[in-house]
A protein has these predicted regions:
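Short beta-strand segments at enzyme active-site cores
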Residues: 1-3, 32-33
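Aromatic/hydrophobic pocket-lining residues that form the small-molecule binding cavity
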Residues: 15, 19, 112
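Catalytic alpha/beta core domains of metabolic enzymes, predominantly
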Residues: 23-29, 36-141
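Conserved short secondary-structure transition element at the edge of the structured enzyme core
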Residues: 93-94, 130-166
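A short acidic, helix-capping loop that chelates divalent metal ions and anchors anionic groups
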Residues: 6-9, 111, 160
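Hydrophobic alpha-helix-in-membranes signature
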Residues: 3-4, 82, 163
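Glycine-rich, proline-tolerant flexible connector loops at the mouths of alpha/beta enzymes
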Residues: 2-14
Length: 170
């Protein structure tokens, strides 16, 4: 899972060069692109992903879409698409996505797996609403601070965070 470089303003050509460089230096790599404009300052377009996959089909194998501009419309054979939120899991599966990649799955893995399995087994969806409700609670806070705060109830090591992060006070 590789995000484009942060802090610099650049366009598709520079993003293409960045990922091309990685693939050329590590040709055995299998890369899931990380589309998260809020953190990197860059938003992947369908065009640049299609070009990367065309030129590097064995290395560019998927995208985690936390910007949510791709997961509903990007269709590339043998290419994995993962929305970045539990609230997008069921809809994503319905339109051909592979699953989700989400930090909150550290907490919601069992529920997310049940939604995933029920979808593939064509069972009635009885856990999706609960899965989305749990995610929405975390969305009310700084996601990573909330995750550390929750997980620190079971394991002290999650209380160790570096500034600017802190545990929740509520």
């Amino acid at each position: 899972l590789i995000m484009p470089p942060a802090y610099y303003k650049y366009g598709d050509e520079e993003a293409y060069a960045f990922f091309s460089n990685i693939v050329q230096r590590v040709p055995e790599s299998e890369i899931v692109l990380y589309n998260f404009e809020k953190l990197s300052g860059y938003k992947f377009s369908k065009k640049i992903i299609e070009k990367l996959v065309k030129d590097y089909p064995k290395q560019i194998v998927g995208v985690k879409d936390s910007t949510y501009n791709l997961y509903e419309t990007l269709k590339i054979p043998n290419f994995m698409i993962f929305p970045g939120s539990e609230t997008k899991l069921l809809k994503g599966l319905e339109i051909g996505c592979s699953g989700i990649i989400s930090a909150i799955c550290n907490v919601t893995a069992a529920l997310a797996r049940k939604v995933y399995d029920d979808f593939h087994n064509k069972n009635k969806q009885t856990f999706n609403e609960k899965l989305c409700a749990v995610r929405e609670v975390f969305d009310n806070y700084n996601l990573i601070s909330g995750l550390h705060s929750f997980m620190s109830e079971e394991n002290e090591k999650y209380k160790r965070v570096l500034p600017p992060l802190s545990l929740l006070s509520e």
